[in-house]
Amino acid sequence: MPEARDRTERPVDYSTIFANRRRHGILLDEPDSRLSLIESPVNPDIGSIGGTGGLVRGNFTTWRPGNGRGGHTPFRLPQGRENMPIVTARRGRGGGLLPSWYPRTPLRDITHIVRAIERRRGAGTGGDDGRVIEIPTHRQVGVLESPVPLSGEHKCSMVTPGPSVGFKRSCPPSTAKVQKMLLDITKEIAEEEAGFITPEKKLLNSIDKVEKIVMAEIQKLKSTPQAKREEREKRVRTLMTMR
């Protein structure tokens, strides 16, 4: 029985192989003895094997599982180039870190979503008059920076809410007086809403009134006998430490 063709030993002329590789830029069929057990065999096309040196004039195809082209993926070496890695076609959209099934959508404008959230909040808190709170866009930045007040600003409440009904706290009488005065200020501001007042002016008026009330309460506390006694004890301690 004749010996199999894949076991036939042929002399290899390395100078001719190197010259053909440089001239044609094609992949050469190395001897079978040089193929390691890990490498996948290269299957040349039938009728494309020449008689000298085992040169392959056609395309090389490597077996790859799960391919729709009969299990082979053809590739070619670039003509006229040396030491270039073989680049195979990829099915993904690039060499990114995300997997191929991850949705890659462009950034969307979420302004309408934010407006819907703000509209729902306004309807739940103080939107009884049907006003819609909108998020300013880039074109409205210049309008917002203007000193002219926008519609719906006089409806904003910038004051401290009163204590909840049915909830009692143990607080000193001075604090109770301050809370009562704050409630009076809230009522005054509610009465002044008939006239047009900006939230900034309303806030400044509230701060001034609260500051005056607090300073008056502090002066009253300093004039009490207990406060005078504490002040005298503090001075005595300071003098004793200076001895």
Curated annotation (Swiss-Prot):
Query: Might you report a single GO cellular component term?
Result: nucleus
Keyword Cell division tagged: yes
Q: Describe the inactivation phenotype.
A: Ectopic endomitosis during somatic cell division leading to gigas cells, large guard cells, and round cells containing large polyploid nuclei in cotyledons. Enhancer of the myb3r4 mutant phenotype. Enhancer of bon1-2 phenotype, leading to dwarf and bushy phenotype with many lateral shoots. Production of diploid gametes by skipping the second meiotic division; male meiosis leads to dyads instead of tetrads, and selfed progeny provides tetraploids (4n) and triploids (3n), but no diploid (2n) plants.
Kindly state the tissue distribution recorded for this protein.
Expressed in rapidly dividing tissues such as shoot apical meristem and young leaves. Associated with cell division but also with specific cell types.
> Which terms under GO biological process does the entry name?
cell division; defense response; DNA replication; endomitotic cell cycle; endosperm development; megagametogenesis; meiosis I; meiosis II
Please provide the record's keywords in A-Z order.
Cell cycle, Cell division, Developmental protein, DNA replication, Meiosis, Mitosis, Phosphoprotein, Plant defense
User: What does it do?
Assistant: Negative regulator of the anaphase-promoting complex/cyclosome (APC/C) ubiquitin ligase required for proper mitotic and meiotic progression and cell fate determination. Involved in entry into both meiosis I and meiosis II. Prevents endomitosis by preferentially inhibiting APC/C(CDC20). Required for megagametophyte and endosperm development. Triggers mitotic cyclins (e.g. CYCB1-1 and CYCB1-2) accumulation. Confers immunity to bacterial pathogens (e.g. Pseudomonas syringae pv. tomato DC3000), which is associated with increased expression of disease resistance (R) genes.
Q: How does it assemble?
A: Interacts with APC/C activators such as FZR1, FZR2, FZR3, CDC20.1 and CDC20.5.
PANTHER family to which the protein is assigned, alphabetical: PROTEIN GIGAS CELL1, PROTEIN POLYCHOME
Identification of the protein by name: Protein GIGAS CELL1
